[in-house]
A protein has these predicted regions:
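Conserved donor-binding/catalytic core segment of Leloir-type glycosyltransferases
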Residues: 7, 43-60, 65-68, 78-79
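Nucleotide-activated donor-binding/catalytic signature segment of Leloir-type glycosyltransferases, i.e.
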Residues: 93-115
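A charged, aromatic-enriched C-terminal amphipathic alpha-helix characteristic of glycosyltransferases
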Residues: 177, 199-235
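Short hydrophobic beta-strand element within catalytic cores of glycosyltransferases
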Residues: 153-156, 163
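Donor nucleotide-sugar binding/catalytic pocket of nucleotide-sugar-dependent glycosyltransferases
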Residues: 2-19, 23-40
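Glycosyltransferase donor-sugar binding loop
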Residues: 77-96, 113
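Acidic donor-binding loop of glycosyltransferase active sites
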Residues: 125-139, 152
Length: 253
């Protein structure tokens, strides 16, 4: 045995390891990712909705930019934060140069490339919708967590662990491998949310999503889960695997 425990960031991820690699469930534990929730802030109704894409380009930026071609309206502005520079792999951006150029050529879009985390957090307080037509099997999704904590509507696919991360709060559609269909489906889903964003029902849903994110995805809760898990693991290693200290790690409340 090369490990005592595997820590997974979602139940979906643990299930994949069990199904594909036959890792027994009792050899793992789920401790989800965490964020520093965006501070609560006042939001007033505005004419133009502020949309955000904040991920590396291969995760769906192409679908998003093609979807904009189908959206014939100007009452929004998209802010794109996308580059491999964040990881020191600037050369990888070359393959997506055409997407960045498309961003630059659309007056409805601002390409911010890479900014500091503190600057991005400031931008979150001005955003309304996370436009994320995800084409990547996320094992978890911190940007969705941050979006919910910032009172943003999350428009995304049900690919990977996104349903688990977003709960019932995202405006989610069924993923498709057909890119052309994906573009059309996402454009429709995004416009539906844009049309209804300021309605009472949507605002109530965003209020609930914010509270959920602040409650379940903050570091205060996650640190305690890690401490409990490590205390349990150390005790088991010291006293044998059949000895378990009564520490309720991975608790959900």
């Amino acid at each position: 045995d090369m490990f005592d425990k595997l820590v997974f960031v979602s139940h979906w991820q643990q299930q994949q390891f069990n199904t594909l690699l036959k890792i027994p469930y009792d050899r793992g534990v789920v401790i989800k990712n965490a964020i520093d929730p965006i501070p609560k802030h006042e939001e007033t109704e505005t004419k133009d909705l502020q949309l955000i894409y904040a991920s590396t380009p291969q995760r769906g930026l192409d679908v998003l930019m093609d979807a904009l071609d189908l959206i014939d309206r100007t009452d929004f502005h998209l802010h794109v934060f996308s580059s491999y520079k964040l990881y020191g792999w600037e050369q990888n951006d070359e393959a997506y140069k055409h997407l960045f150029e498309k961003c630059e050529s659309d007056s409805r879009v601002t390409n911010h490339s890479t900014v500091s985390y503190d600057e991005l957090r400031k931008h979150w307080t001005n955003m309304h919708i996370l436009a994320y037509p995800c084409t990547w099997q996320e094992t978890s999704c911190r940007v969705a967590m941050e979006a919910m904590s910032a009172h943003c509507a999350v428009v995304t696919s049900n690919w990977g662990a996104l349903p688990e991360t977003c709960g019932e709060f995202a405006y989610m559609y069924n993923y498709t491998e057909d890119k052309n269909k994906h573009v059309e489906i996402f454009a429709d889903a995004l416009e539906d949310v844009m049309d209804s964003y300021w309605t009472k029902d949507v605002q109530k849903n965003l209020d609930n999503a914010l509270e959920y994110s602040h409650t379940h995805y903050g570091w205060d809760k996650r640190i305690n889960q890690w401490i409990d898990f490590l205390d349990n693991l150390i005790y088991e290693l010291d006293h044998g695997e059949n000895s378990k200290k009564e520490i309720p790690f991975n608790k959900e409340s």
